[in-house]
Amino acid sequence: MWQGVFPAVTTKFTETDELDHAEMERCFGLQMDAGCDGIIVGGSLGEGPMLSPDEKLAVFKTAKAVSGGKPVLMTINEAGTREACGRAREAKAAGADGLMVVPSMVYHADRDEAVAGLRAVAEAG
């Protein structure tokens, strides 16, 4: 099980609204060098809900490249279970060390629906 500090990192963009991989490498690397035990990408702070699936994977791969072997977790924050399961499978295939799963903010499920959705995402990833 993981322990320690796992900051949810921001996603960096260029002035032309493209992912800024060089700046992310620098910032993610600084956090790892400062003693963080892992990082979380694609969360709300990291513009996750606004990124395309390809952009989310690109940010993850940038983080993984500078992680120094420390865990990199991908946030799953999709509107529906089908989309969330798809992102979880993609994260697993890309080498994610774990997932931070956020229940849908669009559909407010009851307890049983929420548990079923989270279980489906866990099984997919």
Residue ranges and their predicted role:
Residues 1-125:
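Active-site beta->alpha loop and helix N-cap motifs at the rims of alpha/beta catalytic domains
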